[in-house]
Amino acid sequence: MADKRPSSDGRPKDFQAATHWLAGLMDLELGSGPKNPAKKDGGVDVVATNMILFDRRFQNFQIKAERGNTQWLIGIDGDDVRGSALWQPDGAGFISARFSQLHLPAANPPPPGKARAVTSNTGRLPSMDIAADSFQIGKRKFGRLELLSKQEGQDWRIERVRLSSPAGVFSADGVWQGWLDRPQTSLNVNLRVSDLGQFLGNVGYPGAVKRGNAEINGQVSWIGDPYALDPPTLSGNFTLAAKSGQFLKAEPGVGKLLGLISLQSLPKRISLDFRDIFSEGFAFDDIAATVKMDLGEMKTD
């Protein structure tokens, strides 16, 4: 854990703020690094064989932080994450980070009855400007990540999040309300996919669809954090349009297409090309649907 002693040994006044923020952000199991990661020059050098962050376990992780005049310069290197960040501690704080690789392990939710982890022991969540050339969650590959956000009172305003790859682009904006105590996430979303089969394969549904393009527009909300979608509380509405694709035999339902809608729930505005129905699956020319969600229940027009 980071050193929480008063800075009575000549360290800068904001040393405690930096180390407390790191300590509140991470639950560390120290590896070969020093037991006390605080450096005499006011920096922080943490080496961990395991680090738990947002209920995700990172392996072989190192953080080096050096203090500038008004900010901290942070280097991050690990099996899953490589990059650098700049942290300005004034006010709620501001983080600007650039990653060549940001691969988040699959989440391990806390056991029932265990309190939700608090991201910062200051009760404030920093504003963020984050970009990653390669962003991945578990085995799901999302391409390039861009995130802009800022704190507004008890909320965290998501000004822009964008995930882009050759197969498609997802963009959203919204708010993380009451993030510290009673979190709820609300987003305006847009997804444009130029190769539906490749896109679905990247995000964990290989072999569901061949070819195709699609677009989704709408608003969604759920109880919980942005990084922890809760299907039973999911509400909102969106429109779906898809063209020139084919459901493969192994995955005949649109449930695998979006993880939300089944083939049987689609409206009649679907034209089928049956040239490959007996060999590979259903080919479609055009699909259009308006979907409404209420606490996990879904209806289509």
Describe every region a protein language model picked out:
Residues A65-Q71:
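N-terminal mature ectodomain segment of secretory-pathway/periplasmic proteins
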Residues K35, K40:
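Contiguous, function-dense segments enriched for cysteine-driven chemistry
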Residues D3-A18, D41-F54, L73-A115, S120-K141, ...:
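Small-residue helix/turn framework positions
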Residues F58-Q59:
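Extended alpha-helical rod segments
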Residues H20-A23:
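Extended, charged coiled-coil helical stalks used as long, distance-spanning scaffolds
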